[in-house]
């Protein structure tokens, strides 16, 4: 006969009916495999093979099938980023604040000063993949909004800009490691077969903005394009000197400054490659000869002398960039139609520079004009669609040959979090502005974390239906106007109102590397967790009567009274600001005595899920269909939501095991009315997870496959099972008997599975019942040799071992108050390497 809901409740001993026998008789029956199989059949829990079509949507859950296309907002505002500069002497500042730091605090702070990321393999992608075509109908708008976002990050000192293969520029305050690369000298050496070419810079390794002006760059760009000697004063050179350079420089010398579109600019076919390279080498040598006044003997025996460039030789950059700039080629061209881009280019005389350079230049490892990840924009969050957020896709480091094993770190579980934060303190939470962008990244990691764009001309070439990209001639005057279209003209005119002359700047190609840790790499959450936990550890030791705790960028402060909390807030805020940590005071939230943290509400009574999660669960059950197979990917989403609140239900995670089984088998799951009603009843009444209290354990349980024994104070009990049971099942039953007979919330056991409180591997009915009975129970490990219940479980009641007085101390897991972390194992698998390739030649194991 079909199993009724009431019968199911009685099987789980959830009813107060009088038909059920003693617990010691009823509970072992729930471990019976045959009973579990029959219940699964009656509830339709095991019927995974269905022939009718699957349901792919339940309420808002669509699994991996996203039915809503991403929405582009032309009115997106680019968020502003403060000038974030974490103080380099952060350890000294912390020691001034709280005294000597612990070993763990120092180790964590050294880990992020600077952060390092050196994967063994990196895959380089063409610049065309820099900005992802996430919005096919809004390619131009998305391109410029993304470029503006990247420009904002660069101006805020969060990105490096690749200037040459071995140099980069940035804005903001430099760190010491950005000046002392390669022993503080800017030295470029090529291999012997490519000749010997050496340049020297200022000893600090920083080239100031004024020493490398646009005049040099524009002339270098001219030389790369192979212009005639009369087109630039630096391009002319004496034949004899040219010959000597030609003998020493390989014809395939890399281009020098910036990144230009492939094949851009009109190249005179009469100028061959070797003569172009010859002039390029001469110009490069002449240009670099004005960067410093020091002398150095090169390895080939030639002394190279450097002088300062007179300002009178500077020319406007726009003159030198006409031939390489796609934008400025429209300036003097004849309009092809009323929608020709030349109308837009000639709107104003001041078209702005082709390029911008940072306040500082540094030496970097060889960095190609490529990207290692793509970027695109999305809404900042579901509640803020007015601002955009940059999504960086460095997923290559999570798959394939370029996969990196990220370091693991502790996340507080629910019980540890409750033990730590469930108190009668008054709480507030701090908002750290752009938390990831606080942690500096070593410049040697730049070649692995590259983003950028190939320039507007390549995007226009994709849009244009009649564009011709043949023989690398795109950008020449012959097909310059092929990109003109009404759609592009209208888009650019609208964008012109927003960006003005920056349209010209943003239309150029660019390669950027991260100067602060990006959000799209698995190393970043680990580093952020180490950083904030170390800072909170320092704060806790400075104010031992208060509590500071963090998870990622979520920092909470607790004090015994509101006035005390406000004093603490002022002191901690001033301390964090002195370290260079930026807080957003407008987003500081005062919670009172019930803290909202990590999706939970935590008070002196314990922990419950936040209300918005409870409402989601109710909505899910309202939309949940019965007798219809639901796609296992949708089941994943349902289990994700229900699993978050499972610890607050009577039966816990074991109640969801049928769903887990269907997901593991990648089969559809059909909710029967009885199973849905059972789950719904579970989740409509949520019970708080209470804080564990310290105490002395005086109740012990033990079992053998054939019997069980209890020691409750000086009383001893024993019993036998009808049939032999697996040892873990027997131990779990003994613990349940101890809880039900004594009512104690502290039980001693020698079984590790019972200690773990994970009952999902037991027979389904027993797991649900055991979770119900043992909810809120704490366990203490007692060795078998010392367990007072060991003898009764073996049928020996006459022998009485002395009663142990086992103290129990609630654990806060690895999220302890003083940032204690386990020692590093002696051998680690291949993962991120923390030795800089600039100083150490790493060899694979």
Swiss-Prot record:
Keywords: DNA replication, DNA-binding, DNA-directed DNA polymerase, Endonuclease, Host-virus interaction, Hydrolase, Inhibition of host innate immune response by virus, Inhibition of host RLR pathway by virus, Magnesium, Metal-binding, Multifunctional enzyme, Nuclease, Nucleotidyltransferase, RNA-directed DNA polymerase, Transferase, Viral immunoevasion. Multifunctional enzyme that converts the viral RNA genome into dsDNA in viral cytoplasmic capsids. This enzyme displays a DNA polymerase activity that can copy either DNA or RNA templates, and a ribonuclease H (RNase H) activity that cleaves the RNA strand of RNA-DNA heteroduplexes in a partially processive 3'- to 5'-endonucleasic mode. Neo-synthesized pregenomic RNA (pgRNA) are encapsidated together with the P protein, and reverse-transcribed inside the nucleocapsid. One of its GO terms (biological process) is symbiont-mediated suppression of host innate immune response. PROSITE patterns: RT_POL (PS50878). The keyword Nuclease applies. It comes from the Viruses. Belongs to the hepadnaviridae P protein family. The record marks 65 as: Priming of reverse-transcription by covalently linking the first nucleotide of the (-)DNA. This is Protein P. InterPro entries: DNA/RNA_pol_sf (IPR043502), DNApol_viral_C (IPR001462), DNApol_viral_N (IPR000201), HBV_DPOL (IPR037531), Rev_trsase/Diguanyl_cyclase (IPR043128), RT_dom (IPR000477), Viral_Replic_Matur_Polypro (IPR051320). Its EC number is 2.7.7.7, 2.7.7.49, 3.1.26.4. GO terms for molecular function: DNA binding; DNA-directed DNA polymerase activity; metal ion binding; RNA-directed DNA polymerase activity; RNA-DNA hybrid ribonuclease activity. Gene3D superfamilies: 3.30.70.270. Hepadnaviral virions contain probably just one P protein molecule per particle. Activated by host HSP70 and HSP40 in vitro to be able to bind the epsilon loop of the pgRNA. Because deletion of the RNase H region renders the protein partly chaperone-independent, the chaperones may be needed indirectly to relieve occlusion of the RNA-binding site by this domain. Inhibited by several reverse-transcriptase inhibitors: Lamivudine, Adefovir and Entecavir. Residues 180-348 are annotated as: Spacer. Residues 1-179 are annotated as: Terminal protein domain (TP). Residues 359-602 form the Reverse transcriptase domain. Residues 349-692 are annotated as: Polymerase/reverse transcriptase domain (RT). The gene is P.
């Amino acid at each position: 006969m079909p199993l009724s809901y009431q019968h199911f409740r009685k099987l789980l001993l959830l009813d107060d009916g009088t038909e059920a026998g003693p617990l010691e008789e009823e509970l072992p029956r729930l471990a019976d495999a045959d009973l579990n199989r029959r219940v699964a059949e009656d509830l339709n829990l095991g019927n995974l093979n269905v022939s009718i079509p699957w349901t792919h949507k339940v309420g808002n859950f669509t699994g991996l099938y996203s039915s809503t296309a991403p929405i582009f907002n032309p009115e997106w505002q680019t968020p502003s980023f403060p000038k974030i500069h974490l103080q380099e002497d952060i350890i000294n500042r912390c020691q001034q604040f709280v005294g000597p730091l612990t070993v763990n605090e120092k180790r964590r702070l050294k880990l992020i000063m600077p952060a390092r990321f050196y994967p063994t393999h990196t895959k380089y992608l063409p610049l065309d993949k820099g900005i992802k075509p996430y919005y096919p109908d809004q390619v131009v708008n998305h391109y410029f909004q993304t470029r503006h976002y990247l420009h904002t990050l660069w101006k805020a000192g969060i990105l490096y800009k690749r200037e040459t293969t071995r140099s980069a520029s940035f804005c903001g305050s430099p760190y010491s490691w950005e000046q002392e690369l390669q022993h503080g000298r800017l030295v470029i050496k090529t291999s012997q077969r490519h000749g010997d070419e050496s340049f020297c810079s200022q000893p600090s390794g920083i080239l100031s903005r004024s020493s490398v002006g646009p005049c040099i760059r524009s002339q270098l760009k001219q030389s790369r394009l192979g212009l005639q000697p009369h087109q630039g004063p630096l391009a002319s050179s004496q034949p004899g000197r040219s010959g000597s350079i030609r003998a020493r420089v390989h014809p395939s010398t890399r281009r020098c400054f910036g990144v230009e579109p492939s094949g851009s600019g009109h190249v005179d076919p009469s100028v061959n490659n070797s003569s172009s390279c010859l002039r390029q080498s001469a110009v490069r040598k002449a240009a670099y000869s004005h960067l410093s006044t020091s002398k150095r003997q090169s390895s080939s025996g030639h002394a190279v002398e450097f002088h300062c460039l007179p300002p009178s030789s500077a020319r406007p950059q726009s003159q030198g960039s006409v031939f390489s700039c796609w934008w400025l080629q429209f300036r003097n061209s004849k309009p092809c139609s009323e929608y020709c881009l030349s109308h837009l280019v000639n709107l104003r005389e001041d078209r702005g520079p082709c390029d911008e350079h940072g306040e500082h230049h540094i030496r970097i490892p060889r960095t190609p004009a490529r990207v290692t990840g793509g970027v695109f924009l999305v809404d900042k969050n579901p509640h803020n669609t007015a601002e955009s957020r940059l999504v960086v896709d460095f997923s290559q480091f999570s798959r394939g040959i370029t996969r990196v094993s990220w370091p693991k770190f502790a996340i507080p579980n629910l019980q540890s979090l409750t033990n730590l934060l469930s108190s009668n303190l008054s709480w507030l939470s701090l908002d750290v502005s752009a938390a990831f962008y606080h942690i500096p990244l070593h410049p040697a990691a730049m070649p692995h974390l590259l983003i950028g764009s190939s320039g507007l001309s390549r995007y226009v070439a994709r849009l244009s239906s009649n564009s011709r990209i043949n023989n690398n001639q795109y950008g020449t005057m012959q097909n310059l106007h092929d990109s003109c279209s009404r759609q592009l003209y209208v888009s650019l005119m609208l964008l012109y109102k927003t960006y003005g002359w920056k349209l010209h700047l943003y239309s150029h190609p660019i390669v950027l590397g991260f100067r602060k840790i990006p959000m799209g790499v698995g190393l970043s959450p680990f580093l952020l967790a180490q950083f904030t936990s170390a800072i909170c550890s320092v704060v806790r030791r400075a104010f031992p009567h208060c509590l500071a705790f963090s998870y990622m960028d979520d920092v909470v402060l607790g004090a015994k009274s509101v006035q005390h909390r406000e004093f603490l807030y002022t002191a901690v805020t001033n301390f964090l600001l002195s370290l260079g940590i930026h807080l957003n005071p407008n987003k500081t939230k005062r919670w009172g005595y019930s803290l909202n943290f990590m999706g939970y509400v935590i008070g002196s009574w314990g922990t419950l899920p936040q209300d918005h999660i409870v409402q989601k669960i109710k909505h899910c059950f309202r939309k949940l269909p019965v007798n219809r197979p639901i796609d296992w990917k949708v089941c994943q989403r349902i289990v994700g939501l229900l699993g978050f609140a499972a610890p607050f239900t009577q039966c816990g995670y074991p109640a969801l095991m049928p769903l887990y089984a269907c997901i593991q088998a990648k089969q559809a799951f059909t909710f029967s009315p009885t199973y849905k009603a059972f789950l719904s009843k579970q989740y409509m009444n949520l019970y708080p997870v209470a804080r564990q209290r310290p105490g002395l354990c005086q109740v012990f349980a033990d079992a053998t496959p054939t019997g069980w024994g209890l020691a409750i104070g000086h009383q001893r009990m024993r019993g036998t099972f009808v049939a032999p049971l697996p040892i873990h099942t027997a131990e779990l039953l003994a613990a349940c008997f101890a809880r039900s007979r004594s009512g104690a919330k502290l039980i001693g056991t020698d079984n590790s599975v019972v200690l773990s409180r994970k009952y999902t591997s037991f027979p389904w009915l027993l797991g649900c019942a055991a979770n119900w009975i043992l909810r809120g129970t704490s366990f203490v490990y007692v060795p078998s040799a010392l367990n007072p219940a060991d003898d009764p479980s073996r049928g020996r009641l006459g022998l009485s071992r002395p009663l142990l007085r086992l103290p129990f101390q609630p654990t806060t897991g690895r999220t302890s108050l003083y940032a204690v972390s386990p020692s590093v194992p002696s051998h680690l698998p291949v993962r991120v390497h923390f030795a800089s390739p600039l100083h150490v030649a790493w060899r694979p194991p």
